[in-house]
């Protein structure tokens, strides 16, 4: 049994339907629709994601971090349909202001209700801890810029956050947190591809 076969065996034995559909998409000519159907079970009525999508915390409530995880799946399968219900739902959740700190202009990376459900210690919410950073805010801003109507309020919000994020990154480099860096990579790819830094910022 070669490495690919071992990986396939592991996936089929252990994976959730979402990861199985993603595997099939990449290696077995599976469809985007199958991935999206599996992903949709984690989406709540408010458009955000929870329900253990980010497997380190099983909070059923929508959170910025679980919603970010959903955007990573959409990126992975190359979804370009800006009118897809999952995309529309995510934008609705982000526009709602839920779990958004207006003073810092960032989404929380841990939320209070995390503590009510099984979770890894790093997802514990505490008012004393630093639960606001550009993880996942920078990546969520990238998602907004990629998918929102350019004339919408949420698009303008995404641009404002992106501008502040870039300014913070330039003044704070080097960044030692790999999670923050990965979110900035998402943002860079969007800003570089659409020349928004010079045109709109």
What are these model-derived regions, one by one?
Residues 30-35, 39, 52-56:
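Generic N-terminal targeting/processing segments that precede catalytic cores or assembly contacts
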Residues 50-68, 73-147:
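Extended ligand-binding groove/face enriched in aromatic
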Residues 1-15, 24, 53-67, 122-135, ...:
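Solvent-exposed loop and edge beta-strand segments that line ligand/cofactor-binding
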Residues 137-201:
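Hydrophobic, aromatic-enriched interface-forming segments
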Residues 1-5, 19-34, 77-88, 147-159, ...:
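Structural helix-adjacent loops and short alpha-helical linkers that scaffold large soluble proteins
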Residues 6-15, 34-48, 85-106, 151-174, ...:
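Long, well-ordered core segments of solenoidal/helical folds
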Residues 12-32, 43, 47, 60-64, ...:
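Terpene synthase/cyclase
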């Amino acid at each position: 049994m070669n490495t690919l076969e071992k990986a396939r065996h592991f996936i089929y034995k252990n994976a959730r339907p979402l990861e199985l559909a993603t595997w099939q998409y990449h290696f077995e000519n599976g469809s985007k629709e199958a991935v999206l159907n599996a992903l949709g079970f984690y989406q709540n009525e408010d458009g955000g994601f929870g329900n253990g999508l980010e497997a380190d915390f099983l909070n059923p409530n929508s959170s910025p971090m679980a919603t970010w995880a959903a955007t990573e799946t959409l990126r992975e399968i190359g979804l370009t349909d800006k009118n897809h219900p999952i995309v529309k739902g995510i934008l609705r959740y982000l526009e709602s202001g839920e779990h958004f700190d207006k003073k810092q202009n960032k989404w929380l990376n841990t939320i209070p209700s995390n503590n009510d459900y099984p979770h890894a210690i790093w997802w514990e919410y505490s008012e004393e801890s630093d639960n606001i950073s550009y993880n996942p805010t920078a990546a969520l801003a990238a998602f907004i810029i990629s998918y929102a109507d350019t004339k919408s309020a949420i698009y303008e919000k995404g641009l404002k956050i992106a501008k502040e994020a870039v300014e913070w990154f330039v003044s704070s480099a080097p960044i030692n947190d790999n999670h923050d860096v990965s979110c900035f990579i998402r943002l860079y790819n969007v800003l570089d591809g659409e020349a928004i830094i010079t045109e709109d910022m």
